[in-house]
Amino acid sequence: MSTTAPFGTWPSPITPGTITTRTVLLSQVRVDGADTYWVEQRASQAGRNVLLRRDGDGQIGEVLPLTPADELVDVRTRVHEYGGRAYAVDSGIIVVSHAGDGRLYRYDVAHRMRGLVPLTIYGDVRHGDLEIDTGRGLVYAVREDHRGEGEAVNTLVAIPLDGSAARDDSLVRTLVSGTDFVVAPTLSPDGEHLAW
């Protein structure tokens, strides 16, 4: 039996969830040697951003273990509100921004048993647009600091890869300050220059 109803008011078996549940968005593709990395945003996991890797043998899988707080890593940053590069990889070293606690973590693909190593403090500080300098043992990042009064302070910083700044924020070195907007620090191929 058919029913007549005004346009847009009839019951439909198609819901927004039906359309979006299986949606996967891909972004932030990077290559490190024979490995290719990318971020998948998965609607089926409440929009969680997952870091995946295709290794040189063609095997594809999630890369990161649980955080020290036993959380699934959500590879995302809110720097400038819309984000920025939420991870970087160089020579098998990954630095990732976890949306769950706002911290940066280091992960060494070759030494998986070490797990995720916190690199930054908890608090009202965001990091994004990450660039690893393995030669100097640093990760460069745009830092958005919300700890003070008024507007957030945006700086370009260098963070030690050894995890020491997770306990002592004074070890994070400010490279550029005094601007309203800093974005995309990029290391030259020879490692001698940093552009932003």
Predicted regions and their residues:
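Short coil turn/linker residues within repeat-based beta-strand modules
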Residues: 58-60, 101, 109-113, 136, ...
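Non-catalytic, glycine-rich low-complexity segments
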Residues: 2-30
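Beta-propeller domains
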Residues: 2-4, 33-72, 105
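A short beta-strand motif characteristic of beta-propeller blades
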Residues: 12-20, 61-77, 114-121, 171-176
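Beta-propeller blade signature
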Residues: 51-57, 154-165
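Beta-strand C-termini and the immediately following turn/loop, strongest in propeller blades
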Residues: 33, 38-44, 53-55, 86-101, ...
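A flexible loop/linker signature enriched in serine peptidases of the S9 family
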Residues: 40-50, 72-81, 96-104, 120-127, ...
